[in-house]
Structure formats: C-alpha cells, structure tokens
UniProtKB/Swiss-Prot annotation:
SMART domains: Elp3 (SM00729). PROSITE patterns: RADICAL_SAM. It catalyses: [[Fe-S] cluster scaffold protein carrying a second [4Fe-4S](2+) cluster] + N(6)-octanoyl-L-lysyl-[protein] + 2 oxidized [2Fe-2S]-[ferredoxin] + 2 S-adenosyl-L-methionine + 4 H(+) = [[Fe-S] cluster scaffold protein] + N(6)-[(R)-dihydrolipoyl]-L-lysyl-[protein] + 4 Fe(3+) + 2 hydrogen sulfide + 2 5'-deoxyadenosine + 2 L-methionine + 2 reduced [2Fe-2S]-[ferredoxin]. Signal peptide: none annotated. The gene is lipA. This is Lipoyl synthase. Pfam families: LIAS_N, Radical_SAM.
Length: 327
C-alpha cells in the first residue's frame, strides 16, 4: 500500500486556472486576441441518460475525468452509458497548464474506492470502462497498486467489462509500477504523450517525452498481448511535421493505438489555442496513422483520449487475440 504523511495542513486544497499555473517554468501569457472557435468545434447536448449517470456518480462519490477536465464530449459519452473514472482523488501533484484538473497536495487514498468504483461500473452497466488518475508523485508506487486494486474489484463484479487504464508517467517509480500492472493487467494500456517534446517545458513541466515512450515500450515487452495506446493534442504550437514525428516515434516504440484531438483552452489561466486544425488535416493525419501501421486511429477535432474507446479497443483486442479485424 502506498504511504503518505497524514499531518499536512495544505492537503486537500485545490488550485485551478491561474493559481495552479503561477509556478511553472514558462509563464502562461494570454493571446492579445483569442482565435475564434471554428464551426466544426461542437459538442452534443446531453440526454436524460446523462443526468441518470450523474446521479449514480454522486451517489457513489466517484469522480469522472469527463467532469473534472470539462470534456466537451461529456453529454455524448454519458448518454451512451460510458464514462472515464478518475481515481485517487481530484487533486494532481503536477501543474500542466493545458489541463483543467486542480493542483495541490492530494488527500489520503480512499481504501473503499476500488469497491465503490466496481459498484458504479455495475450500476451503470458498462461494457467498457476507462480508469485514469491524477499524478500522485507523493506515493511510493505512483498509485500503481491502487490501479491494480481497482482492476481486481471490477473483474470480480463485472467480469465481462473490458478495462482500459490511462496512467500517469510514474516518474521515478516506473520499475515498481510496471511490475504491479503486469501482475494485474488491464485490457488496454494507455499513457498520453500529449504534445511534441519541444513543447514539454511549456505544456508538460515535470514530464519527459522519452520516459513516456519507454513506459509503453517496456510494458509491451512485458505483456505482448495487451494493446498499447497513446494520444496527443494539437493547437499548442506544434507543426504538422511535429505530429508526424510523434506518430513515427510511437510506432518505433510499438504503440498500436493513437488518439489525436484539438486542444481547447479551459480558461484564460491556461495555455492559449495557437491554431485550430481543420477537419481536412485531421483526415490526412488519420490516413498517415494507418499507413504507419497503427491498428486503430481516433483522430478528429473533438476526439479525446477515451472518446469512443470501446470501439477503438474492439479492433485492437481482436487483433491481439488472433482475430482478423479491418478498419
């Protein structure tokens, strides 16, 4: 079990927006004039199912990343009866200025969370669940055992539900984290590169591009039958060629599934959107991804890491278990 100090007066205080990004190496400078949001950036309105799921989540005291990160697809995904759960609280130890999740010193892990999560998955009757988390640099294993406990709990109560985990980078704790997650594997292993390495100091302070690539490569070597997946955002200052370079790097590290979506600025305290990639360019990226050998590519303005994850995974899982799916 991961251990942390219990007597920290700042524990549980959540910073957001400009308060959160005040101490990162490169300051967030708002654009003089914001880029106008193009007409293809549109989210669907929520249905009744959306509100039913919200009620279940509050009842179980669960956090979804859909809500915490202000995802534009929340209405559509909840209405389909799918959700991405965020475990280990809603306070992150990192200060990434593209992300709308709060920063601070997190609370103690909740030992009942795996059980509560499993009950939520069962109550929502999910056939596919994505589990992600805040970064927990305060824990000795980065939270890997808590991920494993959640996987075990869901397997017990919903054995037919497929599980994807979207993990943090386990900085400084990678060996132990990979060992734990190889002993209790998910159905899909996902870890996001987020952006081009030239933008890491600005967008992902505290993370390392090569470390993130190695995380997925090493896991694939340990667990060859588990599909690996990664995603990036566009609009932070990268070029089209930067995107192609990331795709090539992913394939060189045996990453099989990819997501690429448009970055949308959650508030003025976050990094500004420097470009809106057109639907035509997203189509070109999608074609290039399949040419590079990705088994599945979810690429488009409104795509997020777990958007249509169930459909994406169906293909990869068939292929990794000897099936013969096609795009």
């Amino acid at each position: 079990m991961s251990e942390i100090k219990t007597d920290d007066p700042k524990r549980g205080i959540k910073l957001r927006g400009a308060d959160k990004t005040a101490r990162i190496p490169i300051k967030v400078v708002p654009l003089q004039e914001k880029l106008k949001k193009p007409e293809w950036i549109r989210a669907k309105l929520p249905s009744r199912k959306f509100f039913e799921i919200k009620d279940i989540l509050r009842e179980q005291k669960m956090h979804t990343v859909c809500e915490e990160a202000s995802c534009p697809n929340i209405g559509e995904c909840f209405s389909k009866g799918t959700a991405t759960f965020m475990i280990m609280g809603d306070i992150c130890t990192r200060r990434c200025p593209f992300c709308d999740v709060g920063h601070g010193r997190p609370n103690m892990l909740d030992p009942d969370e795996p059980k509560n999560l499993a009950e939520s998955v069962k109550a929502m009757n999910l056939r596919y669940v994505v589990i992600t988390s805040v970064d927990r640099d305060d824990l000795r294993d980065g939270g890997a055992q808590h991920f494993a406990d959640c996987i075990k709990a869901i397997r017990e109560t919903s054995p037919n539900t497929k599980i994807e985990i979207l993990v943090p980078d386990f900085r400084g704790r990678l060996d132990i984290a990979l060992k734990i997650l190889a002993e209790t594997p998910p159905d899909v292993m996902n870890h996001n590169l987020e952006t081009h390495p030239s933008l890491y100091r600005k967008a992902r302070p505290g993370a390392n591009y090569q470390h993130s690539l190695d995380l997925l490569k090493r896991y694939k070597e340990m667990m060859p039958h588990i599909p690996t997946k990664s995603g990036i955002m566009v609009g932070l200052g990268e070029t089209d060629e930067d995107v192609r370079e990331i795709m090539r790097d992913m394939r060189a590290h045996n990453i099989e599934m990819i997501t690429i979506g448009q970055y949308l600025q959650p508030s003025d305290g976050h990094l500004p959107v420097l470009r809106y990639v057109t639907p035509e360019q997203f189509k070109i990226f999608e074609k290039e991804a399949y040419e590079l050998g990705f088994s599945n590519a979810a690429i488009g303005a409104m795509v997020r890491s777990s958007y249509h994850a169930d459909e994406q995974a169906a293909e990869a899982l068939r292929e990794s278990h000897g099936g013969c799916g096609h795009h």
